[in-house]
Curated annotation (Swiss-Prot):
PROSITE patterns membership: GLYCOSYL_HYDROL_F1_1, GLYCOSYL_HYDROL_F1_2
Enzyme class: hydrolase
Catalyses which reaction(s): Hydrolysis of terminal, non-reducing beta-D-glucosyl residues with release of beta-D-glucose
Biological classification of the source: Bacteria, Bacillati, Bacillota, Bacilli, Bacillales
Protein name as annotated: Beta-glucosidase B
GO biological process: cellulose catabolic process
Gene assigned in the entry: bglB
One Pfam family, short name: Glyco_hydro_1
Entry GO MF terms: beta-glucosidase activity
Active-site feature positions: E167, E356
Family in the record: Belongs to the glycosyl hydrolase 1 family.
Length: 448
């Protein structure tokens, strides 16, 4: 093997990822009712440009074309999410039209020879549930159980890979704590309560999967980052440990160890009110690592201590160059360090799947082509980190590039492009970027 050859295991899973609200559009078609993101987008100043997902990539009408394009680009696996408000538009109502959309999508996926990974929850909570208190209320867990059961009953034998929850950190902390995401609340007590209930839904889905005797694999996806201290000063080291507890350990430790990290419980103090939202049996329900751990990784953080009144009393040091269009540092060495740490501290041999990794770049369409060399470079360097981890015995079994299409990038609207396929939002024309063509060649050779 030459020094520049990175060949992956024969069974390695190559895929691409999307999510329902970011690509589907058709928000008032097919019996769908509003999600919390439809409502959030109407709040002035919450989303850049006042953008929303009403049309997005219009995947609702273009799904056949999109799946065919995946096939042409050589993908073997496709990770997508189901829009909960398409399935449960109101309390006690199951919408057959919504189920049919995903049935037809799965027909296309199977015709194209792709293997599906279905995400049950990627942030589009039905607004009617939020009106009842959303993720701060335990009743939402029962609504989720009904929804997950319907999906499993309808599609159970067609799904090879189940992703219970995508990024519980973002859904809870950004949604109920910082207010950056829907529903836009700024209440730390609500945020930690929401996080607990969302983690419980992972356990609920895992139990349903067992009870129904489904043969597909099931697991959760966490967004995790490698955290470095800005200096060796004790206060900066302690600040970095807090940041790690906030974004990584608060979600990984319940899944793998059945408890919340004690140092963070102590630090959060009154915001948790003695963890009074934790009832007997909750932690046992959550502590179900499943068949795999999904990881979404984009960048590292460099943290120093502050003396302000914020929750963590930390701040992010300015990212070092090079950075993506999000301003996120490109640091593949941290990806390798994170994977090594995850296996050592948490997964301990459980298969790991990279369910998202990619970069927003300022792409330019010139003569019908997009030479996104920055994105290509980002992906290639991060795949080298994956390869190194595997070579050292790491149980990494697959990589899903984010994202298949340019799409609605949450609070950033349409101002950031993560896709390996360019979208002209006026015409809905799809144009594979240079990174997609490189990825096709790479998958065909199972390496580079």
């Amino acid at each position: 093997m030459s020094e520049n050859t990175f060949i992956f295991p024969a069974t390695f899973m190559w895929g691409t990822s999307t999510s329902s609200y970011q690509i589907e559009g058709g928000t008032d078609e097919g019996g769908r009712t509003p999600s919390i993101w439809d409502t959030f987008c109407q709040i002035p100043g919450k989303v850049i440009g006042g953008d929303c997902g009403d049309v997005a990539c219009d995947h609702f009408h273009h799904f056949k074309e999109d799946v065919q394009l995946m096939k042409q680009l050589g993908f073997l696996h496709y990770r997508f999410s189901v829009a909960w408000p398409r399935i449960m538009p109101a309390a006690g109502i199951i919408n057959e039209e919504g189920l049919l959309f995903y049935e037809h999508l799965l027909d296309e996926i199977e015709l194209a020879g792709l293997i599906p990974m279905l995400t049950l929850y990627h942030w589009d909570l039905p607004q009617w549930i939020e009106d009842e208190g959303g993720w701060t209320q335990r009743e939402t867990i029962q609504h989720f159980k009904t929804y997950a059961s319907v999906i499993m009953d309808r599609f159970g034998e067609r799904i090879n890979w189940w992703n219970t929850i995508n990024e519980p950190y973002c859904a809870s902390i950004l949604g109920y704590g910082t207010g950056e995401h829907a529903p836009g609340h700024e209440n730390w007590r609500e945020a930690f309560t929401a996080a607990h209930h969302i983690l419980m839904c992972h356990g609920i889905a895992s139990n349903l999967h067992k009870e129904k005797g489904l043969t597909g694999k099931i697991g959760i996806t966490l967004n995790m980052e490698h955290v470095d201290a800005a200096s060796e000063r004790p206060e900066d080291v302690a600040a970095a440990i807090r940041r790690d507890g906030f974004i990584n350990r608060w979600f990984a430790e319940p899944l793998f160890n059945g408890k919340y990290p004690e140092d963070m419980v102590e630090w959060y103090g009154t915001y948790l009110n003695g963890l009074d939202f934790v009832q007997p049996g909750d932690m046992e329900l959550i502590q179900q690592p499943g068949d795999f751990l999904g990881i979404n990784y984009y960048t590292r953080s460099i943290i120093r201590s502050t003396n302000d009144a914020s929750l963590l009393q930390v701040e992010q040091v300015h990212m070092e160059e090079p950075v993506t269009d999000m301003g996120w540092e490109i640091h593949p060495e941290s990806f390798y360090k994170l994977l090594t740490r995850i296996e050592k501290d948490f997964s301990k041999g459980l298969p790991i799947l990279i369910t998202e990794n990619g970069a927003a770049m300022r792409d330019e369409l010139v003569n019908g082509q997009i030479e996104d060399t920055g994105r290509h470079g980002y992906i290639e360097e991060h795949l080298k980190a994956c390869h190194r981890f595997i070579e050292e015995g790491g149980q990494l079994k697959g990589y899903f590039v984010w994202s298949f299409l340019d799409n609605f990038e949450w609070a950033w609207g349409y101002s950031k492009r993560f896709g390996i396929v360019h979208i002209n939002y006026e015409t809905q024309e799809r144009t594979p970027k240079q990174s997609a063509l490189w990825f096709k060649q790479m998958m065909a050779k199972n390496g580079f």
